[in-house]
């Protein structure tokens, strides 16, 4: 794909050593000083890329290096929306912020984050994207990354993500909900057909 080569050429101009080594990616997740989310999991990224495969999705995720050492990760992909316009995101909608190893100097982190923002601008220019959405992943506060973005943002708004640990049984999941929600959950059990699928396919989400 011609556009894919162009996008990676832009990426390598900023991060010539970047790759997507599975073990290094996992190591960053284990040693991060940030609240890593499900959106930072490599399998989640692969899922979204697969889900949007009919929309020309391209996995642009990166391991970030400093002095030849892996110090951070950046989930990122490009795909076309229903209007055939390109979108940059980490989950089909929003750009997920990078996370870094513990004890990385603030000066180094800020330098890498600046490069990422400039990279996003250049990728957006190549893809003729006029607007991107960003998400804050910190609990009860804004991350430094997101605070910097607020200074540049044209518009801000609040959204909420409800995340569920699907490794638990349905009964265990129910126990973790607040009591006031349980009547609604029980109603859902009565009215919906609820199943657990170990091998999930794209077609199941399209039905």
Model-found features: residue ranges?
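Acyltransferase donor/substrate-recognition loop-hinge adjacent to the catalytic core
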Residues: 1-23, 28, 148-207
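Conserved donor-binding loop and adjoining core beta-sheet/short helix segment
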Residues: 12-17, 46-118
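Hydrophobic, Leu/Ile/Phe/Ala-enriched alpha-helical segments that form helix-helix packing faces
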Residues: 29-32, 48-49, 120-127
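Short, basic/aromatic recognition patches
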Residues: 31-54
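Extracellular structured ligand-interaction cores
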Residues: 59, 95, 129-131, 159-161, ...
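A structural signal for short, well-ordered beta-strand segments and their strand-loop junctions
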Residues: 63, 72-75, 128-136, 163, ...
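Short, solvent-exposed loop/turn segments at secondary-structure junctions
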Residues: 77-81, 95, 137-142, 169, ...
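Non-catalytic accessory segments adjacent to catalytic cores
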Residues: 111-158
């Amino acid at each position: 794909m011609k556009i894919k080569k162009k996008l990676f050429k832009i990426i390598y101009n900023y991060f010539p050593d970047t790759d997507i080594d599975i073990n290094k990616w996992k190591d960053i997740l284990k040693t991060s000083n940030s609240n890593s989310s499900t959106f930072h999991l490599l399998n989640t990224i692969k899922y979204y890329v697969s889900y949007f495969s009919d929309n020309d999705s391209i996995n642009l995720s990166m391991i970030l290096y400093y002095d030849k050492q892996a110090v951070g990760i950046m989930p990122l992909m490009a795909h076309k929306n229903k209007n055939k316009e390109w979108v940059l995101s980490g989950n089909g909608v929003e750009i997920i912020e990078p996370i870094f190893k513990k004890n990385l100097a603030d000066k180094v982190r800020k330098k890498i984050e600046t490069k990422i923002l400039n990279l996003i601008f250049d990728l957006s220019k190549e893809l003729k994207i006029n607007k991107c959405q960003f998400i804050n992943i910190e609990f009860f506060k804004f991350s430094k990354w997101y605070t910097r973005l607020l200074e540049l943002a044209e518009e801000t708004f609040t959204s909420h993500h409800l995340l569920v640990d699907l490794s638990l049984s349905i009964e265990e999941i129910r126990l973790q909900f607040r009591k006031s929600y349980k009547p609604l959950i029980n109603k859902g059990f009565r009215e919906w057909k609820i199943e657990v699928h170990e091998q999930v396919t794209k077609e199941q989400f399209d039905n």
